Amino acid sequence: MNLRPEEISSIIRQQIEKYEVQVEVTDVGTVIQIGDGVARVYGLEDCMYSELLEFPGGTLGMALNLEEDNIGCVILGSYLHIKEGDVVKRTGRIASVPVGEALIGRVVNPVGEPLDGKGPIKTDRFRPIEKIAHGVVFRSPVDTPLQTGIKAVDAMIPIGRGQRELIMGDRQTGKTAIAVDTIINQKGQDCICIYVAIGQKASTVANVIQKLHEEGAMDHTIVVVAGASDPSPLLYIAPFAGAAMGEEFMEAGKDVLVVYDDLSKQAAAYRELSLLLRRPPGREAYPGDVFNLHSRLLERAAKLHPNIGGGSMTALPVIETQQGDVSAYIPTNVISITDGQIILEPDLFYAGVRPAINVGLSVSRVGGKAQRTAMRQVAGQLRLDLAQYRELAAFAQFGSDLDRATRARLTRGERMVELLKQGQYNPMPLEEQVMSIYTGVRGYLDSLPADKVRDFEIEFLKYMRTEKPEIGEDIKVNQKITPENESKLKAAVEEFKQMFVTQHGLS
C-alpha cells in the first residue's frame, strides 16, 4: 500500500479548513441543599417560574420558589443521586406536555412519558401545563348536555358540556364509579375523555384501565397517572397536564371530558411541597394559595364561543371527604369554585342505594338549561319529590298513624329509590332512561311490591327494545316526548304491566 504525501497533506488541509470552535454558553447554578425531593440552587439569576432545570443524569426539576439568593426547585423523579455541589443547567423551557391525537388510547405520566409499553408518543406538539383560562368574552353559555348514562344524575343533577361538577364523598362510596361510567357512556358521542389518576394505588388504576379497555372506551380516552409511589411534584402537576391535553382538543372545536381523581391528594401533595419550600402554612397547614391552585385549574374548563371553534371542556373533579365532613377546607373551596356537586353518602351506599347520591345536598347550578326536553318532561319534579320522601321516611319511623296522601307519597318515593338504582359499568341511553322514569313518575309502579321494581324495569326495557322499538327511537330522534308518542308509550306500559303482573302472580 503506497501512501502519497500530497494526499495526506490535502486531507489534513481540508480538516483544518473545516475546523470550527463551537462555544456553548449555558446558565448554570450549584446545588447548595438537597432533600425530600426539594433542591436549593444557587445562581441561575434569570430563571423563570415553572422553568425546567436539568440536574446531573438528565433528571429534571421545576423552579417553584424564586428567592433573592437561591431557587427552590422540586425534583420530577428520583433525587437520590443528586448531591450538594452538583451543577444545574437551565433548559429555557416551561414545564410542558405532549398533546394531540397521538395520545388517545395511551397511558402516560404527568410529563407525557408513556407507561403502557406501546412505544414513544409520536407528536411534535407541546403545551405548557399552566395557562391562563379563557376570558368571559371567549365563552358561551352551557347549553348542550353531557349524558352520564346514570339515571339519577341525568334526571336530577344534569351536567352540561363545559360545566365543572364536583363528585364528593367518603372513601369507597362510588366516586370513581360515577366518573368511569360517564367516560364509558361517551362512546360514540364524539367526546374525548381524559382520566387523571392522582395518588391512587397502582392496582386501582390498573383495574380502571382494564375496565375501559373491556368496554371499548380507551378508543376515546387518555389516562394520565401519578401514582401513590410517585414523587409529590408529579402529583401536583398531573391535573394541569390533563387540562393542557384537553385544551388542545377544546381549542380545535371538540368536546372534552376531564376527570381529576382526586384533587384532595393533589392538595396534600402541594401542601407537602409548600412546607418543604418553607412557605408559611395556613388553615389545616395548607398554603395560602391552595384556593388559587384549584380555581386556576378548574376555570380552564369552558364552553367556548362559536367564533373561536365552539369546543368545550367539562371537568369532573373528585374530592374525598373525611367522615362526611363537607365543611372542611378543601371541600368548601372546591364547592365554591364548581358549578354544582354530586354528594355521595356511606349510609345510602351500605343500604344498597347505588349510586349513593344524597339528593338533598346535590345540585347542578347550570346543567338544567342543558337538560334534554324529554328528560325534563318526566323528571321535572323528581328531585323535589325524592327530597320530600326522605324527610317523610325519617318522620314515619316515629309513628304509624299516617294519612292516605302521606302513605301514597312514601309508597311512590320508595319505588322511585328502587328505580334509580343502577349497576356499575352499566350506563343507559337517554331514551331508556326516559321510558324507565316515566313508569315511576306516572304511578305505574305504585301497586307493585318494592322488591319487584328492578325486575319490572329490566323486563320492561327488554320488551320495549324488542316489541316497540319505534317508541324509543322517536324519543332519541326528537329529544322529547310528543303527544302521539306519549299515548303509544302509555299503552305499551299498561300492556306490559298487565303481562308482568300475570307472569309473576301479583294480581
UniProtKB/Swiss-Prot annotation:
Pfam families: ATP-synt_ab, ATP-synt_ab_C, ATP-synt_ab_N. ATP binds at residues 169-176. It catalyses: ATP + H2O + 4 H(+)(in) = ADP + phosphate + 5 H(+)(out). It is found in: Cell membrane. Its main location: membrane. It comes from the Bacteria. Keywords: ATP synthesis, ATP-binding, Cell membrane, CF(1), Hydrogen ion transport, Ion transport, Membrane, Nucleotide-binding, Translocase, Transport. Produces ATP from ADP in the presence of a proton gradient across the membrane. The alpha chain is a regulatory subunit. This is ATP synthase subunit alpha. It comes from Desulforudis audaxviator (strain MP104C). The gene is atpA.
